[in-house]
Swiss-Prot record:
Highest rank taxon of the organism: Bacteria
Gene Ontology cellular-component terms listed: plasma membrane; proton-transporting ATP synthase complex
Organism: Lactobacillus johnsonii (strain CNCM I-12250 / La1 / NCC 533)
Annotated Pfam families: OSCP
Keyword Ion transport: yes
Protein name: ATP synthase subunit delta
Organism placement in taxonomy: Bacteria, Bacillati, Bacillota, Bacilli, Lactobacillales
Location(s) in or outside the cell: Cell membrane
Gene3D superfamilies: N-terminal domain of the delta subunit of the F1F0-ATP synthase
Length: 182
């Protein structure tokens, strides 16, 4: 039975993570994978070329070596492994799953700060540091989403946790209390 894309990503990312960890090159492999992810997203033809069964393996190896010379040996070995087992079509899913494992291991969280107006980098950084400290994360990487309907304040979404400090929600709570106390 053929494996689904998610199963392939899960298995291969776990194998890469364990391999990089054993070789004490987890951070280097993580950097390499993020470079690859960026390149793959900007050049989708690259994955099509490396996944194409018509193109000979030695041509694919030449192509790979043309841009992988700065990667760690563990990353190069992993790319060769993907080439050997014809799994390049799953590369982006594998990298995303690897990044999730890496973030969990390093206690790094990602989330969204929803605000009525765009937050500058300093504001986003202060919110990120305060939340990370309060909830025990080593680091919190926040992206800002603007939603004028919240009127003011902030809604933080990190993992399955939502902290709603918006004026809209506070006004709704006050309204409900007033109706309740009639």
């Amino acid at each position: 039975m053929a494996l689904s894309r998610e199963e392939i990503a899960s298995r291969y990312s776990k194998a890469l993570f364990a391999y990089a960890q054993d070789a004490n090159s987890l951070d280097a492999v993580h950097e390499d994978m993020n470079v690859l992810l960026q390149v793959a997203k900007e050049n989708p033809d690259m994955l099509r070329l490396l996944s194409d069964p018509i193109i000979r393996k030695n041509q694919k190896e030449e192509f790979l070596s043309s841009f992988s010379d700065k990667f760690s040996s563990e990353t190069k070995n992993f790319l060769d492994f993907l080439l050997e087992y014809r799994r390049f079509e799953s590369l982006t899913a594998i990298i995303e799953a690897f990044n999730t494992l890496y973030d969990e291991y390093k206690n790094i969280a990602s989330g969204t700060a929803v605000s009525a107006i765009k937050l500058n980098e300093d504001e986003l950084s202060r919110i990120s540091q305060a939340y990370a400290k309060k909830y025990g994360f080593k680091e919190l990487i926040l992206t800002n989403k603007v939603d004028p309907s919240i009127l003011g304040g902030i809604i933080l979404k990190v993992g399955d946790r939502i902290i709603d400090g918006s004026i809209r929600t506070r006004l709704q709570q006050i309204r409900e209390q007033l109706i309740e106390n009639r």
